[in-house]
From Swiss-Prot:
Cell location: Membrane
Organism the protein comes from: Homo sapiens
Database matches in SMART domains: Int_alpha
Consequence of changing residue 957 to L: In GT1; uncertain significance; severe type 1 phenotype; the mutation prevented normal ITGA2B/ITGB3 complex expression on the cell surface; the mutation may interfere with correct folding of the protein
Pfam families: FG-GAP, Integrin_A_Ig_1, Integrin_A_Ig_2, Integrin_A_Ig_3, Integrin_alpha
Protein name as annotated: Integrin alpha-IIb
Amino acid sequence: MARALCPLQALWLLEWVLLLLGPCAAPPAWALNLDPVQLTFYAGPNGSQFGFSLDFHKDSHGRVAIVVGAPRTLGPSQEETGGVFLCPWRAEGGQCPSLLFDLRDETRNVGSQTLQTFKARQGLGASVVSWSDVIVACAPWQHWNVLEKTEEAEKTPVGSCFLAQPESGRRAEYSPCRGNTLSRIYVENDFSWDKRYCEAGFSSVVTQAGELVLGAPGGYYFLGLLAQAPVADIFSSYRPGILLWHVSSQSLSFDSSNPEYFDGYWGYSVAVGEFDGDLNTTEYVVGAPTWSWTLGAVEILDSYYQRLHRLRGEQMASYFGHSVAVTDVNGDGRHDLLVGAPLYMESRADRKLAEVGRVYLFLQPRGPHALGAPSLLLTGTQLYGRFGSAIAPLGDLDRDGYNDIAVAAPYGGPSGRGQVLVFLGQSEGLRSRPSQVLDSPFPTGSAFGFSLRGAVDIDDNGYPDLIVGAYGANQVAVYRAQPVVKASVQLLVQDSLNPAVKSCVLPQTKTPVSCFNIQMCVGATGHNIPQKLSLNAELQLDRQKPRQGRRVLLLGSQQAGTTLNLDLGGKHSPICHTTMAFLRDEADFRDKLSPIVLSLNVSLPPTEAGMAPAVVLHGDTHVQEQTRIVLDCGEDDVCVPQLQLTASVTGSPLLVGADNVLELQMDAANEGEGAYEAELAVHLPQGAHYMRALSNVEGFERLICNQKKENETRVVLCELGNPMKKNAQIGIAMLVSVGNLEEAGESVSFQLQIRSKNSQNPNSKIVLLDVPVRAEAQVELRGNSFPASLVVAAEEGEREQNSLDSWGPKVEHTYELHNNGPGTVNGLHLSIHLPGQSQPSDLLYILDIQPQGGLQCFPQPPVNPLKVDWGLPIPSPSPIHPAHHKRDRRQIFLPEPEQPSRLQDPVLVSCDSAPCTVVQCDLQEMARGQRAMVTVLAFLWLPSLYQRPLDQFVLQSHAWFNVSSLPYAVPPLSLPRGEAQVWTQLLRALEERAIPIWWVLVGVLGGLLLLTILVLAMWKVGFFKRNRPPLEEDDEEGE
């Protein structure tokens, strides 16, 4: 029994699942003539799902109303029996009275059987259809049961439809699947012809001849069936109070044992049309969205239920056949078919499937041919929008001779509120882009567009209107079509403009200019349009150019455009207006080749805010024409240049990491006719930057160049003349800086070309300049000794003899590496050879190796074998004053015969003449400007030194370095390597000697004797005899 509820409950689940999911961006909207501003709304009871189905209804007097189904309306017993409402048409809307039907459960005893109907949750109004003055409202979940003694048929949703004539008050009911067969019989017959789960009326339509056709997707145990009966016979055979009766003229489709139909929901949607060429018969279009294991299909049957065509879905579970519609969209007089698949999934660029929905258009060919492949696919654009859930023929909405359609996406549009898209018919079928997009005026979850009806003129203005149901909001919106004004626009202008013919004068400056006339003509036609019509005409000159770069202007205003208000008379015959324009001076613009485009656009005058215009403008509202400038290019007025370009480069190769500057030297020539807007185009590689460009043309030494992007590549464009005249030759030198070459490869390429805007042979051949890229690094190794020299006594004093507490002075050998660039180096290896291994016979005791700057060093053999704490005070000589070994003033004197005579010449102590300590250092990477240093701390080993009292030494260390690679993909010019040596001079001082006393006495006496002789000589020459200057008293006495 639960299975019987599947079809519509599944539908409801499909429609409600995505109310909480967000939609994608809406497609652009092109407004046509459905007024989206001045809407009419009808509302039903809250929670009734008012708007689940709807249709137009005309009574016998031609009055139009809207019949609306609300399948969850509460009945008299406050149970959800459903309901149907009839809304009289008023522009301002209004109340919708409900149609009265018998909504009570019924029980009748017929012989030994008890017949029962159950109308709670029957879904009255799940489908409604109007024909003539009759309204058909169906309740597909009305349940039925037959009891006989201890047996029953089981309570199942056979479905039923109620018919009403509102004017006469007549009522009837039609339930083609009711029967009195018990469940046991169905089981014995393997459920053949089992109609207990029909859900008759799930879909419904009435033919022009008045035959009611019902889809019952649960019939024959969910294979589906179709029931047909004339409306008149239903009324005539109906007897109130009788629950089981027979319409003699009805017909039902056949049961099938084909597995493809199992659970296919055949009858889920239904439509009628003409598809066999016989105008006296009507064919049935039946949708089965889960046919053949959810592939879906639509079948076209004749009046005897014989299949004429079968259209298969293209994607599993797309629900192909959820909706069907029949209309003639290409104006050939034959019905065409549209099929909706709202769950169709599209494969997108990210290889993910997106559920967007799709509508298939099948154009009926001439002759008795199958429909074949779809002529057009309309695919939704919004994720989970359910595009194609409903399709409605609109009639000829814009009165162009072709019928149009509306397609709903109930969960598309802004915030998933719903959207209806209008597609216009044309001779090829339908236009692939919507002419108008109607966004829901209701909040999210309204399912705006779940039901649609069109093709009826509700306001009697000669244009068909559209009604849209939004059962989630319990409302219906009426969109009225506005009259369409079809404009005809003509623009006349001369073919060419000769700059040399200056027949006009600018009013302000009296400057002669070349001028020409522009004639504009505008007319309008349309059905039921106003007698007086006002249009705005906007004229734009040279519209493809920026406003400041327009080449032609209006003579009077010197502007590039104008707007005119045109009043069309009662017959709307074309009116014309002429204005004059002029060509600007050639020095004021560059482009002399491209056509000068003039455009005329016609529009309706603006309306007040919130008000829609009374008519819609359509047709040729925009027209453009073009003229051109006469050039000095021979009789054909077509210039054909012959552009030549040669180029070379200086400053190569390029070095990675360096600030490279290249000079591109180019020679440009034109051996043909003038090249207009000629320019040199230089495509710069990655890392290159334009600096400046110079030419050898007098007066134009510095070229005007600009940069722009073309296909993600920076291009330098330098002007070469407008035009670049015949036989012109220009030498160009362009400076370009190039950096960031780490990923450039072994070369970079400059692409050079001369371009022009000429139509024939506009460009030169492309010249490629390949500049090699190389890597290089200059690494410098320097060494230093601290101090550079030492002075040590030649002999050992008593206090220091055999003493291990007093070490010799410190000696430091420092090696510094500096990468001067421009590149980075990898795998730097430094090897330092030091004389001595800290043994008693060595002159140096090596205390420690101190690397800096990332170096990792490993000495061999290990240093400081005695574990001397070199943090304790050890004599450290000043680099300015060489250190001496400390001695007391009292000297030790050797016996006279043993005194040394003189010091020996310095002896070189290196790894070539002494045991050696080797220090190996490695640095993984050394960037440009980086420094690294190794300091070797040592002190003199005095016991070994004093064993050779007269020897002087030069202590020499030696260092080498090399680099294994440079971290670039380009070959290096060379791998850095080098060496350095450090020397420390070790000098000896002899013992001081005592001075004899007689040497002192002789020196004193000699000094006194020399002083006496000096005084006597000075006295002899009168040095001590002086004349005093006279005093004042002496002068007075003299007077």
